[in-house]
Design a protein with these regions (language model features):
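Histidine-rich, glycine-flanked metal-binding segment
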Residues: 1-3, 10-55
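Metal-associated gating/positioning segment near the N- to mid-region
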Residues: 49-112
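Short, low-complexity, polar/charged sequence segments that are solvent-exposed and flexible
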Residues: 23-29, 77-80, 113-116
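Short secondary-structure capping/turn segments at boundaries of alpha-helices and beta-strands
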Residues: 8-11, 82
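A short, hydrophobic/aromatic-rich structural module that often spans a beta strand
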Residues: 11, 110-118
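Metal-coordinating catalytic core of metallo-dependent amide/deamination hydrolases
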Residues: 116-127
């Protein structure tokens, strides 16, 4: 499936002006000014995005995706990160790591959480 987003103010990360973005299989395939979808039966949707901005996703290199804390005991633990909250901050790639709580959190649970976030559209690494 091809989707064409037209007339976006694009940053990559510097401002590159008004461009169209062609998306193929959920990934950005091409960014260029004034792409024409006439005569191309492969584009399923073309949306006018005039007035909207497009930025590259941010990378957060230190995230306790499986939760953190625990230095003062079990009541001081924080909950797992949610993909919605991560994406709302403009972050599309996270590097997950364990916190101080080595009793209830493990590399296995960190790996499982990273895979769950990938299923929700994020790119993840663990350390």
């Amino acid at each position: 499936m091809l989707t064409l987003l037209k007339n976006l103010e694009c940053y990559a990360p510097e401002h590159i002006g008004k461009n169209d973005i062609l998306i193929c299989a959920g990934k950005i395939y091409k960014i260029a000014p004034r792409m024409d979808n006439a005569g191309c039966g492969l584009i399923e949707s073309a949306d006018d995005c005039d007035g909207l901005l497009a930025f590259p996703g941010l990378i957060d290199q230190h995230v306790h995706i499986a939760g953190g804390g625990g230095e003062q005991g079990f009541s001081s633990r924080t909950s797992e990160m949610d993909a919605t909250d991560i994406l709302a901050a403009g972050v599309t790639t996270v590097v997950g790591l364990l916190g101080a709580d080595g009793t209830t959190r493990s590399l296995e649970s960190l790996y499982a959480k990273a895979k769950a976030l990938e299923e929700q559209g994020l790119t993840t690494y663990i350390y």
